Amino acid sequence: MGHGKLKKFSENETFACLLQPASGEVLDRQAGEFWSPLNLKDHPMKGHWNEKMFHGRNCPIVLELGCGKGEYTTSLAERNPDVNYIGVDIKGARLWKGAKYATETGLPNVAFLRTRI
């Protein structure tokens, strides 16, 4: 792995704004089945994004599918503080950039979800 991916994966686990599977959850799955909170019928986030991820900010939620590094997601969140944004991508190394920026700048209305679409 190049470009510091292992360091980024490790740091991803510290970002409160990033929801992703723990490494054990991925490894416990059968071959071909990828962990996804969207596949879990009774996932604790279901119906509770504003309450749990956005700390009670009862605002509309906008999803950006395939958000990559999250530049567009974080930019929209900065421009529209009365909207909650969730960037979705499968690549943890990409999500690291957006999650790190959101954490460092204290953006309360942005979150990232690592999963397949």
Where on the chain are the PLM-derived regions?
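Conserved beta-strand/loop positions that form the S-adenosyl-L-methionine
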Residues: 65, 88
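Short beta-strand element of Class I
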Residues: 83-86
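Conserved short alpha-helix immediately C-terminal to the canonical SAM/SAH-binding motif I
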Residues: 94
